[in-house]
């Protein structure tokens, strides 16, 4: 995080989202950068080096993968949805409480994926690869860029109560509808 003392601007950077994947040679990690001005994300980029895909957005200008416009999926029925999530590691806060909710949702959707890089999960929602994504205990650097990209692709990003406090409380739900 880099702040300029003259104006309310900060860069939010995650140089390696999906660190555990990288350590274990799992090819699912990214570099994530967002620009925040006056407490609002206004520009964002997520780069997946192994696929050479660059997802980006500027507030009010749409979302893109490289130079192609991306949009969230149009899946309407929850039972047809492919949902991404993150599961707290065994022994971490919230792990035991998370499992019953995960089981419930698993029985209601087409499929669940746990990929291990929140920024990529979010841009997958933006690109229509996932229909939704939820996770808790996230850091701002994990979700700042991806959240703008989802919104600019026509999706919605909130916390678990439907509010826009996800950057502060680390609880995020991204969906393919507004």
Residue ranges and their predicted role:
Residues 1-38, 45:
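Flexible, acidic active-site loops/lids enriched in D/E/S/T/G that coordinate Mg2+ and/or position polar
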Residues 8, 28, 40-42, 52, ...:
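Conserved catalytic motifs of the protein kinase core domain
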Residues 19, 48, 150:
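Conserved G/P- and acidic residue-centered "switch" motifs that form tight phosphate/ATP-binding loops
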Residues 30-65:
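Anionic-ligand binding patches
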Residues 71-178:
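An extended, acidic
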């Amino acid at each position: 995080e880099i702040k300029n003392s003259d104006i309310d601007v900060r860069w939010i950077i995650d140089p390696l989202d999906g660190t555990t994947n990288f350590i274990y040679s799992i090819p699912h990690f990214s570099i994530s950068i967002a620009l925040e001005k006056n407490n609002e994300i206004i520009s964002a980029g997520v780069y997946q080096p192994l696929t050479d895909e660059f997802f980006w957005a500027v507030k009010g200008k749409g979302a893109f993968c490289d130079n192609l416009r991306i949009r969230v999926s149009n899946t309407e029925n929850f039972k047809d949805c492919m949902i991404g999530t993150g599961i707290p590691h065994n022994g971490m806060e919230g792990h035991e409480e998370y499992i019953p909710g995960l089981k419930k949702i698993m029985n209601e959707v087409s499929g669940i994926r746990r990929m291990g890089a929140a920024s990529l999960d979010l841009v997958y929602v933006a690109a229509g690869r996932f229909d939704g994504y939820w996770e808790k205990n996230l850091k701002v650097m994990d979700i700042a860029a991806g959240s703008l990209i989802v919104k600019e692709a026509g999706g919605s990003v909130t916390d678990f109560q439907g509010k826009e406090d996800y950057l502060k409380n680390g609880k995020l739900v991204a969906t393919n509808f507004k």
